[in-house]
């Protein structure tokens, strides 16, 4: 039963596999990026994270543990000198995997594995607010403001025309009343009794 046995065999014995990954970790820390197959790159990431975590501790015991893995002393000195400043408070994820394509000989998938520094992450965080701040700048435009002003101007005119239209029927209703008012004085008040007198004189006397 294969319990509590991490890692992949990769078709090699344990000693061959350990020697291969020790060489690969040394090359990765020395050149900061190497190309290998996908399966080896995923396993190499575990080795690199373990070594860098030990280097961030910086004590003597951690240095001796790294010396048992990395083959070159100058690479170990460089790693311990830059680990705390370069990786800072980053907890794991010290490497980046980028798939390149197929290898020409056997069409094996090839991956580029490289170290990630703390400065790259801080630069990305600084660039993000700049993009968001640049978006609201081009929103105000003169033609749009003119269109909005032109669209807003007819509204008061329509509001003014509505009371004017409402006042027109009132004026028209008042006009006939004004015209009808002067017609009443045309009938003189004195004529009515005259007609009554004339009618009484012309009427024949009653016979008994």
Curated annotation (Swiss-Prot):
Keyword Ribosomal protein: yes
Single GO term (MF): structural constituent of ribosome
Region described as Disordered: 122-208
Presence of the UniProt keyword Magnesium in the record: no
Residue stretches of biased makeup (Low complexity): 151-179
A single GO BP: translation
One term under GO cellular component: cytosolic large ribosomal subunit
Keyword annotations from UniProtKB, A to Z: Ribonucleoprotein, Ribosomal protein
Assembly and interaction partners: Part of the 50S ribosomal subunit. Contacts protein L32.
Family listed: Belongs to the bacterial ribosomal protein bL17 family.
Protein name (Swiss-Prot/TrEMBL): Large ribosomal subunit protein bL17
Organism: Desulfosudis oleivorans (strain DSM 6200 / JCM 39069 / Hxd3) (Desulfococcus oleovorans)
């Amino acid at each position: 039963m294969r319990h509590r046995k991490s890692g992949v065999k990769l078709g090699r014995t344990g000693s061959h596999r350990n020697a291969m990954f020790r060489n690969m970790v040394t090359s990765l820390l020395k050149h900061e990026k190497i190309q290998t197959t996908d399966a080896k790159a995923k396993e190499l990431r575990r080795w690199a994270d373990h070594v860098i975590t030990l280097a961030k501790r910086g004590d003597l015991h951690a240095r001796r543990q790294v010396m048992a893995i990395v083959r070159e002393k100058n690479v170990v000195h460089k790693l311990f000198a830059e680990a705390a400043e370069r990786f800072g408070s980053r907890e794991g994820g010290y490497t980046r995997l980028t798939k390149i394509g197929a290898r020409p000989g056997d069409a094996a998938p090839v991956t580029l594995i490289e170290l990630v520094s703390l400065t790259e992450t801080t630069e990305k965080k600084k660039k993000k607010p700049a993009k968001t701040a640049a978006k609201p700048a081009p929103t105000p435009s003169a033609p749009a403001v003119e269109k909005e002003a032109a669209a807003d101007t007819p509204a008061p005119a329509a509001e003014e025309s509505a009371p004017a239209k409402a006042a027109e029927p009132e004026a028209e209703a008042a006009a006939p009343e004004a015209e009808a008012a002067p017609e009443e004085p045309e009938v003189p008040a004195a004529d009515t009794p005259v007609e009554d007198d004339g009618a009484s004189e012309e009427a024949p006397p009653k016979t008994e």
